[in-house]
Amino acid sequence: MAWDMCNQDSVWSDIECAALVGEDQPLCPDLPELDLSELDVNDLDTDSFLGGLKWCSDQSEIISNQYNNEPSNIFEKIDEENEANLLAVLTETLDSLPVDEDGLPSFDALTDGDVTTENEASPSSMPDGTPPPQEAEEPSLLKKLLLAPANTQLSYNECSGLSTQNHANHNHRIRTNPAVVKTENSWSNKAKSICQQQKPQRRPCSELLKYLTTNDDPPHTKPTENRNSSRDKCTSKKKAHTQSQTQHLQAKPTTLSLPLTPESPNDPKGSPFENKTIERTLSVELSGTAGLTPPTTPPHKANQDNPFRASPKLKPSCKTVVPPPSKKARYSESSCTQGSNSTKKGPEQSELYAQLSKTSVLTSGHEERKAKRPSLRLFGDHDYCQSINSKTEILVSTSQELHDSRQLENKDAPSSNGPGQIHSSTDSDPCYLRETAEVSRQVSPGSTRKQLQDQEIRAELNKHFGHPSQAVFDDKADKTSELRDSDFSNEQFSKLPMFINSGLAMDGLFDDSEDESDKLNSPWDGTQSYSLFDVSPSCSSFNSPCRDSVSPPKSLFSQRPQRMRSRSRSFSRHRSCSRSPYSRSRSRSPGSRSSSRSCYYYESGHCRHRTHRNSPLCASRSRSPHSRRPRYDSYEEYQHERLKREEYRREYEKRESERAKQRERQRQKAIEERRVIYVGKIRPDTTRTELRDRFEVFGEIEECTVNLRDDGDSYGFITYRYTCDAFAALENGYTLRRSNETDFELYFCGRKQFFKSNYADLDSNSDDFDPACIKSKYDSLDFDSLLKEAQRSLRR
């Protein structure tokens, strides 16, 4: 540990000297000039140290090209060793332990995972292409630091130089708490991986973009236990964070104002790390840091005012979004990312982050194709960057990761997600504006809603989308899961329509919009299914005869206009047949015809009125109730209905004529039997009931009628059941006259007999008289004879 403290003091002293002399000068002019005043000789490995110095003098020409990067290289390796030592201390006894082999294997694993790439043939090559020599003896710590590739420290060196003042101020804090040093670990590892990708002069960014946009399959080379071990290391490392991590990030600049490799006589012209390339690379890294660079700032443009400063609520981790160069490095970077988080848990440490952290790499490459930008500009600490799932990526091991992550989260209480964090990154990428507009509107800066626990989120996801290992993601499922991954409350998701799963629409959902028409799985078949329409069963709740005439929603009309028109015609025909005025079940009285017809028109009109109110599209087809006629699908059906109506009309007329003839025969029979009495000169205000009551004293009356004339004379006919009663009324009827009335006229058979065209011959000698035997004299005369006879009669 004393050796580590000595190296840290030496590094910071050299950085301070470089800041005083100028940033254009090399930060470390020569390795033997390191400040070793505080070095403890007892803890120093003399052979390894001198061997390293001897190798350094032999390779002076190669080392001179990278002296400006050597302090940061040593600083990074010491950080990694301290990180490994801290891991061993925290996992075993939480006591200080000397440096032994426990830390070096993890150091080797991290180094191999971060440096090794699939696109590079020799990862440890120098900028000029000469590989460093390998020694057969046991490599010491300093040898490991010196043998590390030099091009892995380019992006970190200048950032350390620009932030020298902050590191000098906090030197004592770094010395007392070595765990803080690992804050720079994930950042420098990420910078090292990206710097090694950019070997050509103008091609590095294009090749990097090409590699980032390749949507490869989820890695299967690493076993699952590798991820579990990385997750265990992250659990131990995240306990050692302090507040100085945030202060260190606040002192970081957003972009570089000077090139990372200043021109010097030792710098070859053919070096692949030119100014513009390195600036762009570091801009990618710094813009990936959450909240430090505004989303609209170009990668190569320096931002001086730095309006987006880090806050204690923001998470400095951005490692999960920047695509690593290889599948092997992806796991180690993910483990280091979770280890560099603060003690307060955020959404990236939640259960959903464990599920979605593996898919963010492919998602970022997919978004790069949409944005058409030369560099990656995503924020890794925001949920919407991590929650977008690719269609082709379905991780089978998600359930195991969720289970392990839930066990880890039970140790620490999750903290609330700051609403400002969502708003500060809403505009980070234009492709996200459409998908997160509703989420940003619903979350206000002063929102105090209770955040969902991870178990509740997992329960909601399993409820609506099934188990994660068996889920099939589509566009609609991705949007819904994006909402559920944003750590909102239960009330937010309870507003989602529940007819998505059932395929049926609730009341009032199709009143103003037609975008949910695809939810109706069952076609319109005329069945009485109230849940399919925009009117509930309340339409038929008050004894309406048009209960099954509820109109379907507007979307069904737009999808099947012809079929609905045919259904409407057949339905109208059915209604007209059942409510026809010539129904056989109607009463035989003549007045029932008009009442039935008016009832039919009322009911059909009410039905059409309800249909018109519930479905505006029916208004063009509906006519007035009295002018609308039933429609028929075929001419044969029309002929059949017409013949039925004609047949019914003939039968009705026949029955009516038979009734009239029967009444006439009964009247004639009553007249012949002398049971009909004619009563004349009655008052004009006399009613039939009054006349019947007054003459009923003589006997039982079958029929009584009163007729009024225009001249004011009134008369009536009374038909008795028996003839004797009629005679008694004819003889004693005058006794019923009142004082203010005239005498009644009482006759048999009534006056109607006097208006007959054939009268009976009252001559008693009619049988003896034969008109044929009597012949007139004028019958035998012609015209001339008759004329002469007339003239003679005139002379007389």
From Swiss-Prot:
GO annotation terms (biological process): cellular response to oxidative stress; circadian regulation of gene expression; energy homeostasis; gluconeogenesis; negative regulation of neuron apoptotic process; positive regulation of DNA-templated transcription; positive regulation of transcription by RNA polymerase II; regulation of circadian rhythm
Protein name: Peroxisome proliferator-activated receptor gamma coactivator 1-alpha
Species in which this protein is naturally found: Bos taurus (Bovine)
UniProt modified residues of type Phosphothreonine: T176
Biased composition (Basic residues): 562-577
PTMs per UniProt: Phosphorylation by AMPK in skeletal muscle increases activation of its own promoter. Phosphorylated by CLK2.
Disordered: region residues: 98-138, 211-275, 288-374, 398-452, 542-597, 609-637, 648-667
Composition-biased stretches (Basic and acidic residues): 217-235, 401-412
Region feature (Interaction with PPARG): 291-337
Subunit structure: Homooligomer. Interacts with MYBBP1A; inhibits MYBBP1A transcriptional activation. Interacts with PRDM16, LPIN1 and PML. Interacts (via LXXLL motif) with RORA and RORC (via AF-2 motif); activates RORA and RORC transcriptional activation. Interacts with LRPPRC. Interacts with FOXO1. Interacts with NR5A2.
CDD domains: RRM_PPARGC1A
Compositional bias segments (type: Low complexity): 578-597
Disulfide bridges in this chain: none
Residue span, RRM domain: 675-751
Localization per Swiss-Prot or TrEMBL: Nucleus; Nucleus, PML body
